[in-house]
């Protein structure tokens, strides 16, 4: 989720909730149209190319990954940007709402500059991916498909990571919890070395309440839950939680709550003065130090010259 337009989003949420409450009182049940409007409000997809996009970075390989959609094959668009060093860590990048990969390129580049090979995807409905309007279910499915591709690209589980920004943080936590659950059932090691969650929230209802009024029964009204708070308790991997102190869209207290709920090993990095979208840039040195401390990434691996 981007900070821009948070006032307008607050107004849209309030109007949507008023319509939903009126419908519930009149018919005693949910309305398909309102459920669709909820998803539109959750993902707020901006079509086309972001105005600040400078073109596909050199070295990026494009791919389309097949996804089963009820017996019909759809595709999600992906970028694979390998680092220059063969033993570099590899990360699955899961973005938030609004912008497709063209609007995320700057943050993908920052991760690449940290020394990561990066696999980034657009969920169905975003960018060049198939589909129209995503849902909580479809973005979770897309993330799992992308994870399988990352495992093919980087066979060494000790070098695999998951990163999620804002709403993508909820998708990343769901994927990490699912991988933790699968490993617990099988008795095998968790196939990922760590999780990075930046500028995210506890549940969608919590962020909706922050944008509207706390008296509204958001947990009963919303069909899209994105309940990271319960899922993060199930993790079986190190987690780095990052938030900017100046984020006036998603309050940093949500990351503090996620951190409190997460099992060890874990680290909370609050970047002084950073906003919703610039933690890596504003807190670059702190970010690199946190990656080294929690995940054991060598300073040379996370050097800004890597892969540039």
Task: Tell me what each language-model feature is.
Residues 280-293:
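Post-His helix in hydrolase/transferase enzymes
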Residues 73-149, 153:
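Membrane-embedded segments
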Residues 28-68:
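An N-terminal hydrophobic leader/cap segment in hydrolases
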Residues 261-277:
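Catalytic histidine neighborhood in serine/cysteine hydrolases
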């Amino acid at each position: 989720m981007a900070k821009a337009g948070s006032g307008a989003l607050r107004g849209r949420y309030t109007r949507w909730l008023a319509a939903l409450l009126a419908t519930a009182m009149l018919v005693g049940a949910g309305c398909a149209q309102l459920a669709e409007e909820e998803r539109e409000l959750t993902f707020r997809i901006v079509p086309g190319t972001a105005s600040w996009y400078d073109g596909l970075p050199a070295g990026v390989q494009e791919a389309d990954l097949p996804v089963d959609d009820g017996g019909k094959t759809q595709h999600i668009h992906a970028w694979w940007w390998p680092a220059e060093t063969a033993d570099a860590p590899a990360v699955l990048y899961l973005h938030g709402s609004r912008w497709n990969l063209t609007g995320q390129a700057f943050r993908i580049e920052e991760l690449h500059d940290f020394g990561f090979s990066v696999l980034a995807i657009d969920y169905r409905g975003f960018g060049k991916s198939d589909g129209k309007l995503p849902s909580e279910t479809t973005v979770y499915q897309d993330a799992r498909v992308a994870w399988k591709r990352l495992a093919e690209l980087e066979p060494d589980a000790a070098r695999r990571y998951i990163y999620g920004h804002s709403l993508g943080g909820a998708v990343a936590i769901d994927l990490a919890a699912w991988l933790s659950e699968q490993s617990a059932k099988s008795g095998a090691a968790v196939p990922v070395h760590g999780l990075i969650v930046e500028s995210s929230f506890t549940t969608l209802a919590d962020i909706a309440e922050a944008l509207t009024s706390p008296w509204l029964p958001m947990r009963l009204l919303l069909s899209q839950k994105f309940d990271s708070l319960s899922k993060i308790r199930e993790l079986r991997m190190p987690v780095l939680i990052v938030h900017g102190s100046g984020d006036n869209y998603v309050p940093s207290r949500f990351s503090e709550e996620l951190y409190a709920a997460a099992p060890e090993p874990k680290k909370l990095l609050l970047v002084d003065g950073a906003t919703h979208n610039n933690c890596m840039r504003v807190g670059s040195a702190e970010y690199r130090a946190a990656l080294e401390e929690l995940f054991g990434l060598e300073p040379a691996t996370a050097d800004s010259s890597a892969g540039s």
